[in-house]
């Protein structure tokens, strides 16, 4: 998973 994008 992409945590940087989930943080949006």
Swiss-Prot record:
State what protein this is by name: Extended FMRFamide-2
Q: Which organism is it from?
A: Striatophasma naukluftense
Record function comment: FMRFamides and FMRFamide-like peptides are neuropeptides.
Chain positions with Arginine amide modification: 8
* Claim: Secreted is one of the keywords in the record: yes
Asked if the Swiss-Prot or TrEMBL record annotates the protein with the keyword Ligase, the reply is no
State the GO CC annotations.
extracellular region
Tell me the keywords, alphabetical order: Amidation, Neuropeptide, Secreted
* Family designation: Belongs to the FARP (FMRF amide related peptide) family.
Could you list the residue ranges that cross the membrane? none
Gene Ontology annotations of biological process type: neuropeptide signaling pathway
Subcellular localization, per the record? Secreted
